[in-house]
Amino acid sequence: MTEHNVRNFNINFGPQHPAAHGVLRLVLELDGEIVERVDPHIGLLHRGTEKLIETKTYLQAVPYFDRLDYVAPMNQEHAYAMAVEKLLGIEIPIRGQLIRVLYSEIGRILSHLLNVTTQAMDVGALTPPLWGFEEREKLMVFYERASGSRMHAAYFRPGGVHQDLPEQLVQDIGAWCDPFLKALDDIDNLLTGNRIFKQRNVDIGVVSLDECWAWGFSGVMVRGSGAAWDLRRAQPYECYSDLEFDIPIGKNGDNYDRYLIRMIEMRESVRIMKQCVNRLLSDAKTGPFSSIDGKVVPPKRGEMKRSMEALIHHFKLYTEGYHVPAGEVYAAVEAPKGEFGVYLVSDGTNKPYRCKIRAPGYAHLQAMDFMCRGHQLADVAAVLGSLDIVFGEVDR
């Protein structure tokens, strides 16, 4: 019998690959078409965000968070704003909390819509992205009407939100909800029962619950494996404890379960949005939307025209910024991709001493190796789509 010299084949997947979602470079070791090893090379989008934040005042650091997970920008600002508020010990008025929750859920829908539809595109379905982007476009307009920008909003500031929502905008968001559920049903009917979509996702990228905890997973990745762990329920922040919503969990921990969870979560987000809209139009219709002590949030323009103190105050807040008491704090929100945390160290000056950003996608990407082992080459793209990776937050 002749001896065969077996040599595994190494290929590069990315960084300019259409399924690589940005600037991912994977070095794959293949035995025929079976994946033996996956080696993610990251850092191609590294911008030194954490170091840059140390040279900026607390207010100037806000826009950096928009540019991390840039498909759902306001959710990142939320974690940072909460960290600064914890250090300052300030409370947000209820109207400000409702506006924050409303826009956090809009961000969740933005992210899940993009993920579910591009995952469908990765496995060959071309219609869902067109429908998904149609709905995302409407949500981007809501972002723009609240903050003036479609993506990089810088709308959640420490102390509340930057400006109030007009009543008409709140009504328009309420009117968007039901037609969206119908559009979601269309995408659902197209994908959920689709034979090819199921063949490409069922039993691919299976993760057990123990492996989830060992690899530091969070968000949809743990819920897909059967843990009902959601920071909005486990460690409620803002006014989530007063809102009604369910947490979907999967039982197989595969790509398909994670897809189903994202679909259900979009429906739950709409449910939360409806509750926020109702309250913003009834009991929280008027009242302050940001902290009123005047130490953190700059005074209103009208006040500055009348009062010299307000003008001085405004000037101080935008040049020097406010001083945050020394200490360290960790604040986390349930971002669309998982637990997005900000560990903030203050030395009592007007600039953060250290700001560590805990991006959920970073922990998920490192598990590519053990999730893809033994699968076909084509399944690498499916697993990658299911992880929901955005490089802004992975490379920071």
UniProtKB/Swiss-Prot annotation:
Q: Which GO terms describe its molecular function?
A: NAD binding; NADH:ubiquinone reductase (non-electrogenic) activity; quinone binding
Bilayer topology reads: Peripheral membrane protein
Is Cell membrane among the key words of this record? yes
Which top EC class applies here?
translocase
Alphabetically ordered keywords of this record: Cell inner membrane, Cell membrane, Membrane, NAD, Quinone, Translocase, Transport, Ubiquinone
Against InterPro entries, the record matches this protein to:
NADH_Q_OxRdtase_suD, NADH_UbQ_OxRdtase_49kDa_CS, NDH1_su_D/H, NiFe-Hase_large
Q: Where in the cell is it found?
A: Cell inner membrane
Gene3D superfamilies of this UniProt entry? Cytochrome-c3 Hydrogenase, chain B
For this protein, the parts annotated as crossing the membrane are: none
Tell me where it mainly resides. Answer: membrane
GO cellular component term, pick one: plasma membrane
* Catalytic activity of the protein: a quinone + NADH + 5 H(+)(in) = a quinol + NAD(+) + 4 H(+)(out)
**Assembly description:** NDH-1 is composed of 14 different subunits. Subunits NuoB, C, D, E, F, and G constitute the peripheral sector of the complex.
Name the HAMAP family on file: NDH1_NuoD
Which family, according to the similarity comment?
Belongs to the complex I 49 kDa subunit family.
Summarize the protein's role. Answer: NDH-1 shuttles electrons from NADH, via FMN and iron-sulfur (Fe-S) centers, to quinones in the respiratory chain. The immediate electron acceptor for the enzyme in this species is believed to be ubiquinone. Couples the redox reaction to proton translocation (for every two electrons transferred, four hydrogen ions are translocated across the cytoplasmic membrane), and thus conserves the redox energy in a proton gradient.
Q: What is this protein called?
A: NADH-quinone oxidoreductase subunit D
Give the gene name. nuoD
